[in-house]
Amino acid sequence: MVGWLRLYVLDDNEPAPGFRSEWGWSVYLEAPGWRAIFDADTSPSIIEYNAGELGVDLGRLEWGFLSHHHYDHKGGYPAIARARPGLRVYVPPGETGDMASWGLEPVVVKGPTRVAGDALSTGPLSSGLWGIEEHALAVEVEGLGLVVIVGCSHPGVDRLAEAAARAAGARGVAVVIGGFHGPSRATLDRLAGMARWICPTHCSGSEAKEYVRTTYPDKYCAARTGSVLQVDRDGPALERY
């Protein structure tokens, strides 16, 4: 377990003043002993610019994580390759060509996998009709539980949260943050039954954000491009929004 986890939102659809943004999602993760990147937006230039504004060094990354193959999550990885050539990136099945061509080292995840001592992949879940294989990242924070970072949640954000808990041998999850892909209220209700904090971003949609904010105000947390969240045993605290 880590004592704390800090999340720097490099890109979300909504930017804070002074940041650049487009449709995409990317988070720089920092914990005691490692730094990683979860997804990488659409644009290398936006990743580089916002990393500079947030004061994070892409060259210090130790590993990367790609939730699924859509370009608004992987298109900025050339910037990562420039800063950290040969970086190991955990990817779902079928997602190796672009990463390798950009000079990164794709590692295909076929099931629940520890990617660091205190971080694990849920393993890929299928979205059924769409045929998209997507996995989520879970980090165990001491005294709190699992922080689950999702990309677009094509298989369902509730299913990804359940898979994270199952992979970690936990009863539930503490925090879920990322794109929820326009979820139904029933999906959000199920998520609220297993998560203490819910942070919808990216493709979640304004209706989902408002539903969580008004129906579960004690569980809601917000983030956008430029946000910095510190997560420890007390839960997520927004250091910068």
PLM region spans:
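Short Pro/Gly-enriched beta-strand edge/turn motifs at strand-loop
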Residues: 2-15, 116-124
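Active-site metal-binding motif and surrounding structural segment of the metallo-beta-lactamase
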Residues: 45-90, 165-175, 196
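Conserved beta-strand hairpin/beta-sheet module of binuclear metal-dependent hydrolase folds
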Residues: 5-54, 134-150
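Cap/insert and terminal regions of metallo-dependent hydrolase folds
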Residues: 73-76, 145-146, 152-231
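Structural motif
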Residues: 5-8, 35-36, 63, 87-89, ...
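Catalytic core of the metallo-beta-lactamase
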Residues: 25-27, 37, 108-169
